[in-house]
UniProtKB/Swiss-Prot annotation:
UniProt PTM: Carboxylation allows a single lysine to coordinate two nickel ions.
Coiled-coil residues: none
Domain Urease: start-end pairs: 133-571
A biological-process GO annotation: urea catabolic process
Encoding gene per record: ureC
Taxonomic lineage of the native organism: Bacteria, Pseudomonadati, Pseudomonadota, Gammaproteobacteria, Enterobacterales
List of residues binding Ni(2+) 2: K221, H250, H276
Involved pathway(s): Nitrogen metabolism; urea degradation; CO(2) and NH(3) from urea (urease route): step 1/1
Pfam families linked: Amidohydro_1, Urease_alpha
Annotated substrate binding sites: H223
Enzyme class: hydrolase
Similarity section: Belongs to the metallo-dependent hydrolases superfamily. Urease alpha subunit family.
Modified residues (N6-carboxylysine): K221
Species this chain originates from: Photorhabdus laumondii subsp. laumondii (strain DSM 15139 / CIP 105565 / TT01) (Photorhabdus luminescens subsp. laumondii)
Protein name: Urease subunit alpha
Chief site of localization: cytoplasm
Length: 571
């Protein structure tokens, strides 16, 4: 059999097993662990290439038995799959195959269900990286334009609350009451992302919560600005257990209703998603970070403090004053803001992410966080932690696969598991909805090349539409056909409770998007957090705020420069 050099092969078909890829300008290198295609029978689109009539494309089969879309020879980076090279087959908006595509009449080893034919389109993935699209579980629905910025950084799913720029929405991720819930469910009909709405979890009895769950929320939020009391937490968790939804909490910074130990007691061992697990964004001062040691706690933190930089402390004060309706002329308000910003716990937050103790990243959009920077901050933090802490014990000698996959999990599969949507989204696996992001390695984590939503490209870097090619300047992100008309509704999902599904919320509100129920939100724990399931003992010194993890001081110095930064942006 004829052979070619590895360098020639990479030029033609992209990297294969054993090849390494640098991610942007970071210090992170991934190595392809296995290749599921067949050497010499690769599916390649283009003039003179193999995916032609009667060659790699079957010219007899009808659409029923062939792919709608094939992504050829792409490097898959997925928290569950690892780092693999494969073709990815999409049909009906879902992933139906990962392996070898083509024409089984002419090619050996074609994976069942991955036949290419007359009804198949192709994306050339030879020199690209494919990930599951990002999931942001901490969105303040302040402005609909957040969607554009999120898509431009590879995020296709929003979980959060709010109704626009009210003071309540600016401070809390809560859509309060059936009237607001129904208006927001209808508003999202025209926005090209998946969505799940969080209702207000503050009640002394069940019915005010139950009516929101039946109205169509996918979870509840308990927030200190509305009173994160132990009674509210217990009641919300009790109702959530009965109706299989998730509860998110932003705890009591002022410790008015109790301390962190009291809040842990109020959880009563039940599953809960803790926002701001470090505390700069809010929560028991100074030691909310201790909840990350609990098996029933699914901990996330937000991107303003990740990675920990020399300006992190300074910018957080003003963020808090604006978001939480505080007055800089009132000493008590100033003290409240200052109590939340602790460099020692911010440094520890970064370390705990690197150790796999904090399981998820989110943005806290326009309410102390940046919705268009989740993938960016994930990769910047991974780079900064490798620079500060060296290789992880789990990493191989010559690649950073484990560390990179740990961080990818924080923005893909783990948020999906926490919010009860991992049966639909969160990973590059057969059967999942085809919400996928294609990246050029040099732009990984910064600027995706294509965002695929439900099997259709809905967001992409595109040049001048009046040019003779797609590439001439100015190139910037533009909505594609998948984000328009009825196709938007066919490729996007609104997540609601099972109770709302059974009551026919889709029909009663006239929703045209796909509507699906969240499930398995309660019978999960920290051990289900992929590559981020550690539960060490965490202690915080009440005087110095120093954090110790299993007795060892957990800290890093603030970074002065970060990867994936000004080299990639004009400002």
């Amino acid at each position: 059999m004829p052979t070619i050099s590895r360098q020639e092969y990479v030029g033609l078909f992209g990297p294969t097993t054993g090849d390494k890829i640098r991610l942007g300008d970071t210090n992170l290198f991934i190595e392809i662990e296995k290749d599921l295609r067949g050497y010499g029978d690769e599916s390649v689109y283009g003039g003179g290439k193999s995916l032609r009539d009667g060659m790699g494309a079957d010219n007899r089969m009808t659409s029923e038995n062939i792919l709608d879309l094939v992504i050829t020879s792409v490097t898959i980076l997925d928290a569950r799959q690892g780092v693999i090279k494969a073709d990815v087959g999409i049909k009906g908006g879902r992933i139906v195959g990962i392996g070898k595509s083509g024409n089984p009449n002419m090619m050996n080893g074609v994976t069942p269900g991955m036949v290419v034919g007359v009804s198949t389109d192709a994306i050339s993935g030879e020199h690209l990286i494919l990930t599951a699209a990002g999931i942001d579980t901490h969105i303040h629905f302040i402005s609909p334009q957040q969607v554009e910025h999120a898509l431009s950084n590879g995020v296709t799913t929003f979980f959060g609350g709010g109704v626009g720029p009210t003071d309540g929405t600016n401070g809390t991720t809560v859509t309060a009451g059936p009237w607001h819930i129904h208006r927001m469910l209808r508003a999202f009909e025209s926005l090209p992302v998946n969505v799940g709405i969080l209702g207000k979890g503050h009640a002394a009895v069940a019915m005010p919560l139950v009516e929101q769950i039946k109205a169509g929320v996918a979870g509840l939020k308990v927030h200190e600005d509305w009173g994160a009391t132990n009674s509210a937490l217990r009641n919300a968790l009790r109702v959530a257990d009965e109706m299989d939804i998730q509860v998110a909490v932003h705890t009591d910074s002022l410790n008015e209703g109790g301390y962190v130990e009291d809040t842990i007691d109020a959880f009563e061992g039940r599953t809960i998603h803790t926002f701001h697990t470090e505390g700069a964004g809010g929560g028991h001062a100074p030691d909310i970070i201790k909840v990350a040691s609990q098996m029933n706690v699914l901990p996330s933190s937000t991107n303003p403090t990740l990675p920990y930089g020399i300006n992190s402390q300074a910018e957080l004060f003003d963020m808090i004053m604006v978001c939480h309706n505080l007055n800089p002329k009132v000493p008590a308000d100033v003290a409240f803001s200052e109590s939340r910003v602790r460099p020692e716990t911010i440094a520890a937050e970064n370390v705990l992410h690197d150790m796999g103790v904090l399981s998820m990243f989110s943005s806290d959009s326009q309410a102390m966080g940046r919705v268009g920077e989740n993938w960016l901050r994930v990769m910047q933090t991974a780079h900064a932690m490798k620079a500060a802490r060296g290789k992880l014990p789990e990493d191989a000698a010559h690649n950073d696969n484990f560390r990179v996959l740990r961080y990818v999990a924080k923005i893909t599969i783990n948020p999906a598991i926490a919010q009860g949507i991992s049966h639909v989204l969160g990973s590059v696996e057969v059967g999942k909805m085809a919400d996928l992001v294609l990246w050029e390695p040099r732009f990984f984590g910064v600027k995706p090349k294509l965002v695929i939503k439900g099997g259709m490209i809905n967001w992409a870097v595109m040049g001048d539409p009046n040019a003779s090619l797609p590439t001439p300047q100015p190139t910037f992100y533009r909505p594609m056909f998948g984000a328009l008309g009825k196709t938007l509704q066919e490729t996007c999902v609104t997540f609601v409770s099972q109770a709302a599904m059974e009551l026919g919320v889709k029909e009663s509100l006239g929703l045209e998007r796909q509507v699906m129920a969240v499930h398995n939100c309660r019978a999960i724990s920290k051990k289900d957090m992929v590559r981020n399931a550690e539960t060490p003992t965490i202690e915080v010194d009440a005087e110095t705020f120093a954090v110790r993890v299993n007795g060892e001081y957990a800290t890093v110095k603030p970074v002065r420069t970060v990867a994936l930064n000004q080299r990639y942006f004009f400002s």
